[in-house]
Protein backbone atom coordinates (compact mmCIF):
# COMPACT_ATOMS: atom_id res chain seq x y z
CA UNK A 1 0.00 0.00 0.00
CA UNK A 2 2.79 2.41 0.94
CA UNK A 3 4.54 1.48 -2.26
CA UNK A 4 1.49 2.39 -4.35
CA UNK A 5 1.13 5.66 -2.48
CA UNK A 6 4.77 6.51 -3.17
CA UNK A 7 4.30 5.69 -6.86
CA UNK A 8 1.24 7.95 -7.12
CA UNK A 9 3.04 10.81 -5.36
CA UNK A 10 6.03 10.49 -7.70
CA UNK A 11 3.75 10.50 -10.74
CA UNK A 12 2.04 13.64 -9.53
CA UNK A 13 5.39 15.36 -9.02
CA UNK A 14 7.07 14.28 -12.26
CA UNK A 15 4.34 14.18 -14.93
CA UNK A 16 3.12 17.78 -14.62
CA UNK A 17 6.66 19.04 -15.22
CA UNK A 18 6.92 16.91 -18.35
CA UNK A 19 3.56 18.11 -19.59
CA UNK A 20 4.45 21.76 -18.98
CA UNK A 21 7.80 21.57 -20.76
CA UNK A 22 7.66 23.57 -23.97
CA UNK A 23 9.57 25.90 -26.22
CA UNK A 24 9.13 29.59 -25.46
CA UNK A 25 10.06 32.22 -28.08
CA UNK A 26 11.37 35.58 -26.93
CA UNK A 27 12.01 38.50 -29.28
CA UNK A 28 14.50 40.99 -27.76
CA UNK A 29 13.69 43.48 -30.54
CA UNK A 30 10.17 43.60 -32.03
CA UNK A 31 10.52 46.71 -34.24
CA UNK A 32 13.35 47.87 -36.50
CA UNK A 33 13.31 51.44 -37.80
CA UNK A 34 15.31 51.90 -41.01
CA UNK A 35 14.81 55.66 -40.74
CA UNK A 36 14.93 57.64 -43.98
CA UNK A 37 15.58 55.50 -47.08
CA UNK A 38 15.99 56.69 -50.69
CA UNK A 39 13.37 55.19 -53.01
CA UNK A 40 16.07 54.22 -55.52
CA UNK A 41 17.84 51.99 -52.95
CA UNK A 42 18.05 48.34 -53.92
CA UNK A 43 17.18 47.07 -50.44
CA UNK A 44 17.83 47.55 -46.75
CA UNK A 45 18.21 44.64 -44.36
CA UNK A 46 17.87 43.88 -40.67
CA UNK A 47 17.82 40.89 -38.34
CA UNK A 48 15.41 39.80 -35.63
CA UNK A 49 16.68 37.42 -32.99
CA UNK A 50 14.33 34.65 -31.78
CA UNK A 51 15.57 33.23 -28.46
CA UNK A 52 14.34 29.92 -27.06
CA UNK A 53 13.89 30.57 -23.34
CA UNK A 54 11.86 27.38 -22.86
CA UNK A 55 13.00 23.86 -22.11
CA UNK A 56 12.09 22.10 -25.38
CA UNK A 57 13.50 22.67 -28.89
CA UNK A 58 11.94 25.60 -30.76
CA UNK A 59 11.02 25.28 -34.43
CA UNK A 60 10.34 28.23 -36.68
CA UNK A 61 7.60 26.72 -38.83
CA UNK A 62 7.16 29.63 -41.20
CA UNK A 63 7.75 33.34 -41.73
CA UNK A 64 5.28 35.41 -43.76
CA UNK A 65 5.46 39.05 -44.83
CA UNK A 66 2.60 41.51 -45.23
CA UNK A 67 3.55 42.83 -48.67
CA UNK A 68 5.65 42.19 -51.77
CA UNK A 69 8.10 44.96 -50.84
CA UNK A 70 9.40 42.80 -47.97
CA UNK A 71 11.04 39.37 -47.83
CA UNK A 72 12.28 37.21 -44.98
CA UNK A 73 14.50 34.16 -44.58
CA UNK A 74 15.15 31.99 -41.54
CA UNK A 75 16.81 28.77 -40.43
CA UNK A 76 14.69 25.64 -40.49
CA UNK A 77 16.90 23.96 -37.88
CA UNK A 78 15.60 23.32 -34.36
CA UNK A 79 16.70 25.90 -31.79
CA UNK A 80 17.89 24.25 -28.58
CA UNK A 81 16.80 25.65 -25.20
CA UNK A 82 19.02 28.63 -24.38
CA UNK A 83 20.00 29.18 -28.03
CA UNK A 84 18.59 31.56 -30.60
CA UNK A 85 17.88 31.82 -34.31
CA UNK A 86 17.76 34.83 -36.61
CA UNK A 87 15.04 35.97 -39.00
CA UNK A 88 16.61 38.06 -41.79
CA UNK A 89 14.33 40.72 -43.29
CA UNK A 90 14.83 42.76 -46.48
CA UNK A 91 12.78 45.81 -47.45
CA UNK A 92 12.75 46.92 -51.11
CA UNK A 93 11.85 50.65 -51.35
CA UNK A 94 12.14 50.86 -55.16
CA UNK A 95 9.36 53.08 -56.55
CA UNK A 96 7.76 53.57 -53.12
CA UNK A 97 7.16 56.87 -51.36
CA UNK A 98 6.10 57.79 -47.83
CA UNK A 99 5.96 56.11 -44.44
CA UNK A 100 5.90 52.33 -44.24
CA UNK A 101 5.13 49.99 -41.36
CA UNK A 102 5.35 46.36 -42.42
CA UNK A 103 4.57 43.28 -40.35
CA UNK A 104 6.48 40.00 -40.49
CA UNK A 105 4.59 37.04 -39.01
CA UNK A 106 6.68 34.33 -37.34
CA UNK A 107 5.01 30.94 -36.75
CA UNK A 108 6.65 28.65 -34.18
CA UNK A 109 5.83 25.53 -32.15
CA UNK A 110 5.10 27.73 -29.12
CA UNK A 111 2.00 29.14 -27.45
CA UNK A 112 1.00 31.48 -28.97
CA UNK A 113 1.97 29.98 -32.30
CA UNK A 114 1.87 33.27 -34.24
CA UNK A 115 4.07 36.22 -33.27
CA UNK A 116 5.10 39.26 -35.24
CA UNK A 117 7.91 41.74 -35.67
CA UNK A 118 7.76 44.99 -37.62
CA UNK A 119 9.91 47.22 -39.78
CA UNK A 120 9.46 50.95 -40.29
CA UNK A 121 10.85 53.28 -42.93
CA UNK A 122 10.32 56.70 -44.44
CA UNK A 123 10.93 56.37 -48.18
CA UNK A 124 11.85 59.63 -49.92
CA UNK A 125 12.96 60.65 -53.45
CA UNK A 126 16.71 60.32 -54.17
CA UNK A 127 18.77 63.14 -52.68
CA UNK A 128 16.18 63.96 -49.99
CA UNK A 129 17.29 61.32 -47.50
CA UNK A 130 19.44 63.69 -45.42
Model regions: which residues?
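Sec/Tat signal peptide C-region and signal peptidase I cleavage site
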Residues: 15-21
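Short, acidic/polar linear motifs in exposed loop/turn regions
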Residues: 53-56, 95, 110
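Sec-dependent N-terminal signal peptides
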Residues: 4-15
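Terminal connector regions
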Residues: 97-127
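Short, hydrophobic beta-strand segments
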Residues: 87-95
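Surface-exposed binding patches on compact interaction domains or structured appendages
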Residues: 55-86
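Buried hydrophobic-core signal for structured, non-transmembrane domains
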Residues: 46-52, 89, 102-107
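Beta-sheet-dominated interaction scaffolds and their linkers
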Residues: 21-53, 126-130
Amino acid sequence: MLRNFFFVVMCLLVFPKCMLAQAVAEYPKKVHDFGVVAENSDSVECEFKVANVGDKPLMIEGVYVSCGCTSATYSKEAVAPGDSAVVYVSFFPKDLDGRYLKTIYVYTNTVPRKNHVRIKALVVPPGKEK
